[in-house]
Amino acid sequence: MRLREAILANLPRLMHEAEHYGKINIQDGTKGGRSGASAPRWIEVDEHIHDALRYAEQVSPDGSRNLLASSESYFDFQQRIVRPARHILQMHSLKGFHELRAAYACERYEQITHHLAPINGGDCFQTDHHLDHKARVQISYELGHSRIDVVSAYIGGRA
């Protein structure tokens, strides 16, 4: 999920989907007008995602369906929570939240192909073009990108 998607996610709906379908549909806070039933983006839920959803529900303000308090703007949340958290990431040599998306993409590539992502020294593209392409299509979908070439920025190119 993008940071905005995570902040604005309808947590009760995601928990319901996770428990009943084993996957969640990313709809809120999406980029480029791709939201709701018109542009479904179903993501399989593993134990890590379940844990993250449970934690998000625990820290969600009373009366809120997402991470924002009812009187809080997205900008206020950015200033109060995101900026300090970004500073913590930087203290651990991470440039920001986008690097966490890249780590997720690399992990998914490895789960799908059973090879390291190209950026981590993997060579799946050289040994199995079809499997590499399948992984890129899936990861592109999960990240909410309409073009698979964008995935190369996260997992590395095909060289």
Place the predicted regions along the sequence by residue.
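Active-site/catalytic core of tyrosine-dependent DNA strand-transfer enzymes
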Residues: 44-113
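Short, basic interhelical loop/turn and adjoining N-cap
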Residues: 13-16, 145-150
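Residues in the recognition helix of alpha-helical DNA-binding motifs
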Residues: 9, 142, 153-154
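Conserved tyrosine-mediated DNA breakage-rejoining catalytic core shared by Y-recombinases
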Residues: 4, 8-54
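Major-groove recognition helix of helix-turn-helix-like DNA-binding domains
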Residues: 148-158
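C-terminal catalytic core of tyrosine-transesterase DNA break-rejoin enzymes
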Residues: 101-145
